[in-house]
Amino acid sequence: MSAEERFAQLPRAAMRKSRAILIRRYLLGESSLIVHWCTGDHGLLKTVARGARRPKSPFAGRLDLFFTADIAWSPSRRSDLHTLTEATLVAPRLGLRDSYGRTLAAAYFTSMVDLVVEREAPVPEFHDLLGRALDWLDSHEPTAAAVRRFED
């Protein structure tokens, strides 16, 4: 039996699903993205969205900063970079792009979460806090008091 046949017989990891907030994304080659998510039940996740930059991609318009989406991914057996298979937009938070201050505050909040949350560990309280903060910023200008409250 060849190595490919043995590999094909290995059990596949079950697809996982979660509601997630997109906190970071990078280009990968000409057509793909590496996307970082904050989820309540799986912590911080890194996924690769293959072909996401193609015009007819199923991910078109669904993978932008601060978006909340219901995602599905296939876990990797070799690394912490999983394969994104689905993304259904839940909350685009378009108001965050209305002013530089809102965008800056949202970026600060997501970077704080990225620094303090453990990879692939359940963190529902941080996911909820970030979601509420981004929802508030979607319709309000940031204040020093709001930033301090988030930090506390």
Residue positions per predicted region:
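Non-catalytic alpha-helical scaffolds and adjoining flexible linkers that form interface surfaces
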Residues: 2-152
